[in-house]
């Protein structure tokens, strides 16, 4: 029997995935209605920053300059550059292409982690699970209709976004355990806004 708290977390995860999945289509609609990728990013991060402020009071800065620079790198790679390249990709490529390519970010991250850290090797079980999850996501996105619509500029921008997310993941791995998640998230929003 699932406990109430577990149920709450599952609902929160489902809500998060739904919102994340809707961003590709909603961004495409906003671009079609004359908003630029930078404007979309600015609106998204400004709203997120304002929403997180009540939960992230207290500490304003990291404990040292090195950590503050890592937080700035996270805001740049996982904030402004990631979302700008993703939003720009949606100007040139269908949302289905962009979402599929961006969803390869965990694979790139796992590959790089296995090259950089000996203890981070992907097991066969994880590789099979990742492949099955990706195949399932492809089936959902394509909805049973496979139409190959290449858009080199958009597809390369989407791949750039996936690789930027890989960099962001590595930066967060280096700093993750030293600060509360809400502090890190607020700083990522802050530096993302600052570097737009």
Please annotate each region the language model reported.
Residues 1-39, 76, 148-174, 182-183, ...:
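Glycine-/small-residue-enriched transmembrane alpha-helix faces in small-molecule transporters
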Residues 11, 18, 23, 47-51, ...:
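Alpha-helical transmembrane segments of compact multi-pass small-molecule transporters, enriched
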Residues 15, 43, 74, 101-104, ...:
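Hydrophobic core positions of alpha-helical segments in small-molecule transporters
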Residues 19, 23-24, 53-102, 137-139:
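Specific transmembrane alpha-helical segments of multi-pass solute transporters/efflux pumps
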Residues 30, 40, 44, 89, ...:
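Hydrophobic/aromatic residues within transmembrane alpha-helices
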Residues 32-39, 84-104, 177-182:
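Structural motif at transmembrane-helix junctions in multi-pass transporters
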Residues 52, 72, 104, 111-112, ...:
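Hydrophobic transmembrane alpha-helices of multi-pass small-molecule transport proteins
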Residues 64-70, 99-102, 118-139, 148-155:
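Loop-to-transmembrane alpha-helix entry segments
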């Amino acid at each position: 029997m699932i406990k109430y708290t577990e149920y709450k977390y599952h609902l929160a995860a489902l809500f998060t995935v739904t919102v994340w999945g809707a961003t590709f289509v909603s961004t495409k609609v906003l671009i079609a209605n004359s908003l630029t990728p930078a404007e979309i990013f600015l609106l998204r991060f400004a709203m997120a920053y304002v929403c997180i402020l009540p939960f992230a009071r207290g500490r304003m800065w990291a404990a040292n300059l090195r950590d503050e620079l890592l937080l700035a790198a996270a805001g740049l790679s996982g904030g402004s550059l990631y979302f700008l390249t993703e939003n720009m990709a949606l100007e040139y490529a269908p949302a289905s292409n962009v979402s599929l390519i961006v969803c390869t970010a965990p694979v790139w991250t796992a590959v790089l982690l296995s090259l950089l850290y000996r203890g981070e090797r992907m097991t066969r079980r994880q590789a099979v699970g990742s492949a099955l999850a990706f195949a399932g996501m492809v089936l959902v996105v394509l909805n049973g209709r496979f139409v190959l619509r290449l858009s080199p500029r958009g597809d390369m921008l989407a791949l750039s976004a996936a690789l930027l997310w890989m960099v962001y993941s590595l930066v967060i791995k280096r700093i993750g355990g030293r600060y509360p998640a809400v502090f890190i998230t607020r700083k990522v929003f802050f530096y993302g806004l600052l570097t737009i």
